[in-house]
UniProtKB/Swiss-Prot annotation:
Protein name according to UniProt: Prodigiosin synthesizing transferase PigC
Single GO MF annotation: kinase activity
Keyword Ligase attached: yes
Disruption phenotype: Cells lacking this gene show a white phenotype and produce 4-hydroxy-2,2'-bipyrrole-5-carbaldehyde (HBC), 4- methoxy-2,2'-bipyrrole-5-carbaldehyde (MBC), 4-hydroxy-2,2'-bipyrrole-5-methanol (HBM) and 2-methyl-3-n-amyl-pyrrole (MAP).
Annotated organism of origin: Serratia sp. (strain ATCC 39006)
């Protein structure tokens, strides 16, 4: 008796693996065990084989031309009998219902090998014709290059089944692991969940809650309830889109205790069926839990062994004794980085950093291995290695002075000794001093010219790059373009480095002079340090204000801004008759100048303002509603600075006054040069990103990788592919992408490593979120003087939450960078978890004349939006009155 070509997945044990494929067989097992699985049919592997024999000549199947086979499959007519069977199955699932069409290769999601993601999956498919097209696309995906590679490696049959399954229009969804993805512990179940559809969890687009439960008892061991500003759901056209979460649900748990118990019970049952650890996709609709997919875990979880910041170090003394810090490493690498961001930092470390720092006056730049370090997705500076090299230079000969400025209170230097040695001595030191002196003279003579050259380079290269048609360039031409970017990236970093180091040195000298000569000037030393440079980040804000002024002058254009959300304006403004001229004129001019800016710019996976201008448009909407007179604010800050400075200088000795004024002038000049040259190398990093996206666009058409894989691509593997030294299947192998994706997931689940560390680190699961309402005050670093009482606004995702910010609120964030500056113009004060005297939040707050306290470590965990804060920027304290207390008192 012939097996039907389309069968219902009903739990019937007569349905075999070679009929249903791995995914279909997995679902059938779950249904047989009585587990809740949405209704599904399977277009069997035999249906594929019958189709392929009829429509694709045998010669094409054997000559290895994958593209020809794919095209034949996609453009052939499905035999009428099979078309009827597929149509009947679709209607049986519900009249014109929305379904998922998933490939189910013979070894996919099987016990021997997990092929999850090798073949195609289509969600929210509606209509018989659309279903038929997607079935053919799944068949064709068997012949995608990345799938073909794995098919040959596993020696599986060239056949594929297709699953037609009802879509669960989820209230909440996510992923569940029957072993801890960080520690590898098998006695825990770890659940990541979000509001809405689960696509946001898998792609990393949305913030998730995390729950850890005891597998045997179901007891809740830990939970991380995060602010969830957005969620995935279908729009009115049936497309999956990112929407804003209703305010009332943003901080609520996305799962109830009863739903958690359902999930952990199902996890135990599914594990018994498979006799192995699983990761399970699930959804909740109307309080019922559905299992969507169960996969054997093929990437072994890492046990929580100690790790070292320098993965290349072989010397035990250096491994145990080197001091690493991420204090003052620059906002381009602050915070958790994706695997792409980390691999780009390693590219920078190996090829750029050494030659760049040589321009600071280092005769010996040592070896790239001692420059930087990495722990759990965070980037560190090797302070021991840097101090060792800087001993060549007279101003930094005292290495502990340099070393301790990067330390936190937890670091004990009592027994510390630089593991790399004492540095140059004797005649070698004399030669290095002479080299340093010559380089300083050269830098001083060329400084003004260097700044002009870097500004011109940025403008010229931006204009040239925007004129390129990347889609028309061959891979070899793209490689040549990348090599050009390499040259200018190095040149611009080398130009920036002397200004960067001299700014630090002058700031430290200024701070010491203030401490010596301003004994009782509580907080005033911070104020006289303000207004010492023409910050480019402030130029950005002034540029946005200028755009707003243009919009204000055009009534119809202003109405468009007022009537539409920022994400709607992104698609509307370029095509609308009212706004097209503005978009192509003033707004384009702004993007030419500032469009390469963004967040964490060394993480190439994060869009820049030109890639996604929705944040800029949101700020413009805010400024239209709440006008900002930034020039007035800056004048007031400058006037106050002058008054304070005059009062302080009048009480000083002539020598002290001369020294302080000289340092202020020198620091201001150097900081201005630093800020003027920085955008050039930032722009070069955007060029890298653009070419990566173009390459991924081409690989998507070949079925190898897509833009969704960008965060998990290894930058140097990408470069090797474009250079022609390795094939795409190797550079973008699914195994590599999956490994990087899993590692990033581990990092998200791990407790954030310390800001500074000596020796090994033991990864830890995140501690329960602090929500102790008894904590009434926090103390950190006094960063910008002044006092203010105002409501808090906690923002952890700038791109999504910017529109929530209201004028005269205190901005509370993990850290800030240049992309946050426009919000400072509206803020009453600034509070951050991470920061130092030269971090973005401190410098810009002082420029804008608003109080700031940084390095509070847990402010974003303890403070909630709506809490009333008393912010003292002179003493570094924040007093909290929680919203619940105010409501009770009221």
């Amino acid at each position: 008796m012939n097996q039907p070509l389309v069968v219902e997945i009903s739990g019937d044990k007569a349905l075999e693996h070679h009929h249903l494929g791995g995914k279909g067989y997995s679902l059938n097992n779950l249904i047989h065990a009585g587990l809740p699985v949405p209704s599904a049919f399977c277009v069997t592997a035999q249906a594929y084989q019958q189709f392929i024999e009829e429509v694709v000549p045998g010669a094409e199947l054997t000559d290895g031309d994958l593209i020809a086979v794919r095209d034949a499959i996609l453009h052939a007519d499905i035999p009428d009998s099979l078309k009827q069977a597929i149509g009947d199955a679709y209607q049986h699932l519900g009249h014109d219902t929305t379904i998922a069409v998933r490939s189910s290769a013979l070894d996919e999601d099987g016990q021997r090998q997990s092929f999850a993601g090798q073949y195609e999956t289509y969600l929210h498919v509606k209509g018989s014709e659309a279903v038929l097209h997607k079935v053919q696309a799944c068949w064709a995906s068997l012949w995608a290059e990345r799938a073909a590679q794995y098919r040959h490696e596993s020696a599986s049959h060239s056949a594929i089944a297709v699953i037609l399954q009802v879509m669960v229009d989820a209230d909440a969804a996510g992923v569940m692991f029957t072993q801890d993805p960080l520690s590898g512990s098998t006695d825990k179940v770890v659940i990541d969940s979000c509001w809405g559809l689960g696509e946001g969890v898998v792609s990393g687009q949305v913030t998730t809650d995390s729950f850890t439960l005891d597998k045997a008892t179901g007891e809740l061991c830990d939970q991380q309830i995060r602010h969830k500003p957005n969620y995935c759901q279908r729009d009115e056209h049936g497309l999956v889109t990112l929407l804003q979460t209703p305010e009332a649900k943003r901080d609520l748990p996305s799962l109830t205790p009863a739903q958690l118990q359902q999930l952990v019970t199902l996890a135990r049952q599914a594990q018994l069926i498979y006799s192995t650890e699983l990761d399970i996709e699930w959804a909740v609709k109307d309080d019922k839990v559905w299992l969507l997919q169960a996969r054997p875990v093929t990437t072994s979880a890492k046990t929580a062994n100690v790790i070292y910041a320098n993965p290349w170090e072989s010397d035990p003394a250096a491994k145990e004794g080197a001091f690493f810090s991420r204090m003052d490493t620059g906002e381009i690498v602050t915070g958790l980085m994706t695997p792409l961001g980390l691999s780009f930092c390693q590219f920078y470390q190996k090829h750029i950093h050494g030659p760049a720092i040589k321009t600071m006056g280092l005769a010996d730049i040592s070896h790239w291995q001692i420059y930087m370090g990495y722990i759990q997705g965070y980037v560190y500076l090797n302070i021991s290695g840097s101090a060792y090299m800087l001993r060549q230079c007279p101003p930094t000969r005292n290495e502990m002075k340099f070393t301790t400025r990067y330390a936190t209170d937890e670091i004990d230097f009592k027994d510390y000794k630089n593991p790399y040695g004492a540095g140059v001595q004797g005649w070698d030191y004399a030669k290095s001093c002479w080299y340093w002196l010559k380089q300083q003279v050269r830098n001083m003579r060329s400084a003004a010219r260097t700044v002009e050259q870097m500004i011109a380079l940025r403008q010229d290269e931006t204009t040239r790059f925007l004129g390129l048609d990347l889609t028309a360039m061959t891979l070899q031409q793209l490689d040549q373009e990348l090599q050009r970017i390499d040259r200018f990236f190095l040149d611009s970093c080398a130009a920036y480095m002397p200004f960067f180091l001299q700014s630090f040195a002058l700031y430290d000298a200024l701070a010491q002079a203030c401490e010596r000569h301003i004994k009782d000037g509580k907080g005033l030393q911070n104020r006289i340090k303000a207004s010492m440079n023409n910050l480019r980040t402030i130029e950005v804000t002034l540029g946005i204000i200028k755009l707003v002024a243009t919009v204000n002058q055009q009534t119809e254009l202003k109405a468009l801004f007022e009537q539409h959300r920022a994400d709607e304006l992104v698609t509307l403004l370029p095509v609308h008759d009212i706004s097209r001229a503005f978009w192509q004129g003033d707004f384009e001019d702004f993007l030419v100048e500032f469009g390469s800016r963004g967040r964490q710019e060394f993480d190439l996976s994060i869009p820049r303002w030109r890639d996604d201008p929705s944040y800029l448009l949101q700020v413009m909407k805010m400024y239209l509603q709440h006008p900002v007179d930034l020039h007035k604010k800056l004048r007031e800050t400058e006037l106050l600075r002058q008054q304070d400075s005059e009062a302080l200088f009048s009480a000083m000795s002539w020598s002290g006054r001369f020294k302080l004024k000289t340092l202020i002038k020198l620091y201001g000049m150097m900081a201005e040069r630093r800020e003027a040259t920085r955008p050039t190398f930032i722009t070069e990093t955007w060029f890298y990103r653009c070419i990566m996206l173009e390459v991924l666009r081409r690989l998507d058409a070949q079925g190898i990788a897509s833009s969704a894989d960008l965060p998990y691509v290894d930058f140097e593997q990408f470069r090797a592919y474009v250079a022609g030294t390795i094939p795409a299947e190797q550079a973008f192998s699914k195994a590599r992408l999956d490994q990087n994706r899993h590692q990033h997931l581990f990092n998200l689940h791990a407790e954030e490593p310390p800001m500074a560390i000596v020796g090994p680190y033991t990864p830890k699961v995140k501690a329960p979120t602090q929500d102790d309402k008894t904590i009434r005050s926090l103390t950190g670093l006094a960063a910008s003087p002044g006092n203010v009482v105002a409501k808090a606004r906690v923002i952890t995702d700038l791109q999504v939450q910017a529109g929530e910010f209201q004028p005269d609120e205190i901005l509370v964030a993990r850290f800030t960078d240049a992309s946050w500056t426009p919000l400072f113009a509206l803020a009453a004060g600034i509070v951050t978890d991470i920061g130092s005297t030269l971090s973005h939040s401190c410098i810009v707050a002082r420029e804008f004349g608003i109080p700031a306290v940084v390095n509070l470590k847990t402010a974003t965990q303890i403070i909630n939006s709506g809490d009333m804060l008393i912010l003292d920027g002179d003493s570094g304290t924040v007093i909290i009155q929680h919203q619940e207390e105010r409501n009770h008192d009221g």
